Amino acid sequence: MTHDHKLKVEAIKRGTVIDHIPAQVGFKILSLFRLTETDERITVGFNLPSENLGKKDLIKIENVFLTAEQANRLAMYAPQATVNIIDDYQVVNKMALSLPELLEDVVPCPNSNCISHNEPVQSSFRVKKFASDVVLTCKYCEKEFERHAVIR
């Protein structure tokens, strides 16, 4: 007699699944993107096994559907993530993420002297993609930052 001791994250009937999030980043995504500001059920998995990443995080939100624009904002924190739209337990749309050219209200400016810290404005960065990194230029102080300096 064999016993299967694996627990699986329950499938959702309708909603959004954000998969292939780097381990330890899922909670940050939940918080920064205010994904918990819903009455719908949210299922999360942290440090799940992953062939590509070693470990990954996973977020499932029932009856909430991210647009491509919303999904692409996640690419700053989880560039290899995929966003799957689910209907009747089936993936009806699978989105690979791509950083937008303009990133607004996603990350704060690392320059402590930037006016975005003291004025009622949302952060805004122009995004330049290079083969090995991403450089963000703040709309207000015009300073350039590499991705790792911004996402902390």
UniProtKB/Swiss-Prot annotation:
Keyword field contains Transcription regulation: no
SUPFAM superfamilies: Aspartate carbamoyltransferase, Regulatory-chain, C-terminal domain, Aspartate carbamoyltransferase, Regulatory-chain, N-terminal domain
Residues that span the membrane, as ranges: none
The protein, known as: Aspartate carbamoyltransferase regulatory chain
Residues engaged in binding Zn(2+): C109, C114, C138, C141
PANTHER family to which the protein is assigned, alphabetical: ASPARTATE CARBAMOYLTRANSFERASE REGULATORY CHAIN (PTHR35805:SF1)
Source species: Proteus mirabilis (strain HI4320)
Co-factor binding details: Binds 1 zinc ion per subunit.
Pfam families hit by this protein: PyrI, PyrI_C
GO cellular component: aspartate carbamoyltransferase complex
GO terms, molecular function: metal ion binding
InterPro entries named in the record: Asp_carbamoyltransf_reg_N, Asp_carbamoylTrfase_reg, Asp_carbamoyltrfase_reg_C, Asp_carbatrfase_reg_C_sf, Asp_carbatrfase_reg_N_sf
Recorded superkingdom: Bacteria
Keyword entries, A-Z: Metal-binding, Pyrimidine biosynthesis, Zinc
Assembly and binders: Contains catalytic and regulatory chains.
Function: Involved in allosteric regulation of aspartate carbamoyltransferase.
Lineage, opening ranks: Bacteria, Pseudomonadati, Pseudomonadota, Gammaproteobacteria, Enterobacterales
Biological-process GO terms, alphabetical: 'de novo' pyrimidine nucleobase biosynthetic process; pyrimidine nucleotide biosynthetic process
Gene (UniProt): pyrI
Needed cofactors: Zn(2+)
Sequence similarity: Belongs to the PyrI family.
Presence of the UniProt keyword Zinc in the record: yes
